[in-house]
């Protein structure tokens, strides 16, 4: 193993505990066996918590059950991975505990699954220990293209910070349009492979009969139509990152070949006997339930465990509605930067969008913004300008819009420490241009005030508690537009 470690086997079923200890001894794994009552005394025999590779957890009959024991283990070492013996983690367990459960093992465990699970625990442990040894703490806004202050997006950022510059395989889970490729590109950009290529491939968009050639390349004459030799995606990604999007759509025969490459880091082009070595990091993504596919026999379990070393789950947009206003600002800013027009949304329209279900997630929101920018160039969008399916409040319902806005602002402030809260601003590790930062902050607040005031400068100045003439000067400074009826007052 990568260093001297022991497995901590905690099980109140003595017969099962004894049987599993025999299996682990046969595999050459050192373990400490105990029950749920005396685990602290046994763990005290270790020099420190990092000497424990993982915990194999079986029946827990002590007070509070498995959840209480897992909380105790987390207080001892929050980075300690868990392998469950028997049933998988119940759905009602807290998310922070479920995230540390890497696998569940049936008794007697299969040889391959036990080895794969221990391998995942080893990679998981090594990854966290490397980050801890470096003492690296990236600032929360490092991954800037992940827009939002919700708890869900903060958790994604935190997990990305932990795994970015390791070589661990990452499996990104989430509905279509939630930004899985954005996460993959961020992981590559902030890894030690950032100078290497990032090569995406959509496994569901390539016909099954062409997928092998697409991934591994082919030699001239390997099949009808192969008039020249061609490098595959693995070759193109050598030294960098290969992003396998929609991995759940990969046919079973291709899954076997992919598993071999992941295990041996070698492959052959179609029509060639020459074995090539490859050094790539694998990031996979899917919107499908791979565990259900394993049960149905449409996805290989061993491949799943190879890919699922570090899972990251993207929340759907309907579960982080407090991010919608920020996403709108970001999407509009990108349009303006690309000189594709601009629009603004009033408060009622934003509140109406917050009540939409968003089956297409962020992609659906981006398409809506682009559509409205074409239909109402440089206009202020109210509820009446939204397509019918997005109208969930009335423009006149200002009281509802105000209360909803306050609720969203409160949620965002609690999650992210926005101005007005006690949480301090975070200085990026690379530093920043304070003058530019403050100018951007001021411009953003002015724009928010103008949006809330429907573009009326006088009302916006009242919200900002400054003189109207001062606001006009600042708007001229930043090149911001204002309503025609205000221009006549100057």
Curated annotation (Swiss-Prot):
Chain's role: AAA+ ATPase enhancer-binding protein that acts as a transcription regulator and plays a role in the modulation of mucin adhesion and flagellar gene expression. In addition to flagella genes, also regulates expression of biofilm-related genes. Functions as a transcriptional repressor in the absence of c-di-GMP and as an activator when c-di-GMP is present.
Effect of disrupting the coding gene: Deletion results in the concomitant loss of motility, mucin adhesion, and the ability to synthesize flagellin.
Per the record, the gene is: fleQ
Query: Which GO BP terms apply?
Result: DNA-templated transcription; negative regulation of extracellular matrix assembly; positive regulation of cell-substrate adhesion; positive regulation of cilium-dependent cell motility; positive regulation of DNA-templated transcription; regulation of bacterial-type flagellum-dependent cell motility; regulation of DNA-templated transcription
> Which GO CC annotations does the UniProt entry carry?
protein-DNA complex
Q: What is the effect of changing residue 330 to A?
A: More than 75% repressed pel transcription
The record's InterPro entries line, in alphabetical order, gives: AAA+_ATPase, CheY-like_superfamily, FleQ, Homeodomain-like_sf, HTH_Fis, P-loop_NTPase, Sigma_54_int, Sigma_54_int_dom_ATP-bd_1
User: Which key words are in the record?
Assistant: ATP-binding, DNA-binding, Nucleotide-binding, Transcription, Transcription regulation
**Which parts of the chain are coiled coil?**
none
Which molecular function term from Gene Ontology is one that the record holds?
cis-regulatory region sequence-specific DNA binding
Impact when changing residue 185 to E: More than 75% repressed pel transcription
Q: Recite the lineage of the species.
A: Bacteria, Pseudomonadati, Pseudomonadota, Gammaproteobacteria, Pseudomonadales
Give the binding site residues for 3',3'-c-di-GMP: 142, 186-189, 330-341
**Record-given protein name:** Transcriptional regulator FleQ
